[in-house]
Amino acid sequence: MDPNCSCATGNSCTCASSCKCKECKCTSCKKSCCSCCPAGCTKCAQGCICKGASDKCSCCA
């Protein structure tokens, strides 16, 4: 378990606004931490608490 997250490491989860989990793959883009899309992908950027930049973002389709 990630001590900063309510899910097992690597599993899907919903994170709080103060999310610090690094290995978590959060399922909700707008109310959780997620890997953020490049600047051109505004869908993912809105309300997303970035935990790192990514050029592969499922929220960006």
From Swiss-Prot:
Subunit and partners: Monomer.
Family membership: Belongs to the metallothionein superfamily. Type 1 family.
Molecular function, one GO term: zinc ion binding
Q: Which residues carry this modification: N-acetylmethionine?
A: 1
Q: Which residues carry this modification: Phosphoserine?
A: 58
**Mind listing the UniProt keywords for this protein, alphabetically?**
Acetylation, Cadmium, Copper, Metal-binding, Metal-thiolate cluster, Phosphoprotein, Zinc
Annotated region (Beta), positions in chain: 1-29
One Pfam family it belongs to:
Metallothio
**Residues annotated as binding a divalent metal cation 7:** 50, 57, 59-60
Protein's recorded name: Metallothionein-1A
Binding-site residues, a divalent metal cation 5: 34, 36-37, 50
Q: What is known of its domains?
A: Class I metallothioneins contain 2 metal-binding domains: four divalent ions are chelated within cluster A of the alpha domain and are coordinated via cysteinyl thiolate bridges to 11 cysteine ligands. Cluster B, the corresponding region within the beta domain, can ligate three divalent ions to 9 cysteines.
